[in-house]
A protein has these predicted regions:
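Short Gly/Thr/Asp-enriched flexible loops that form oxyanion-binding sites at enzyme active sites
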Residues: 7-18
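Short acidic loop-to-helix transition motifs that present clustered carboxylates
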Residues: 5-7, 30-31
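Proline-centered loop/turn at the N-terminus of a beta-strand
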Residues: 19-21, 46
Length: 107
């Protein structure tokens, strides 16, 4: 999507009965202008709006939507989410093993 075309998810949503996912792109105004052009939709024209530059979450949301009608895809999504959980558990364990030495300074 072109930076100037952040209105396109709304145009597409108005033309199709299918779900539309909008991903605002960080350009001017830190992406706030893109967010507003995607999120401010009239009643009856919904667009699922992701975070600025949130294309990865857009892909994950699309897979979750498709998985509601596909047991194999749902199982893969469950495995993916479990792998994310395990990464966090591992990172927390590693972080808890880090030792710091502090020098207290009296004020």
């Amino acid at each position: 999507m072109c930076i100037r075309d952040s209105h396109l998810p709304g145009v597409i949503a108005a033309m199709t009965p299918l779900p539309v996912i909008g991903v605002p792109i960080k350009a001017s105004l830190e992406g706030f202008d893109s967010i507003m052009s995607i999120v401010q939709m009239p009643p009856g024209i919904p667009v699922a709006t992701m975070a600025v530059n949130g294309a990865m979450n857009a892909g994950i949301l699309a897979v979750q939507m498709m998985a509601t009608g596909d047991a194999e895809l749902m199982q893969k999504m469950i495995q993916y989410k479990e792998s994310l959980k395990q990464k966090i558990v591992k990172a927390n364990k590693e972080l808890s093993e880090v030792k710091y030495k502090f020098k207290r300074i009296e004020i």
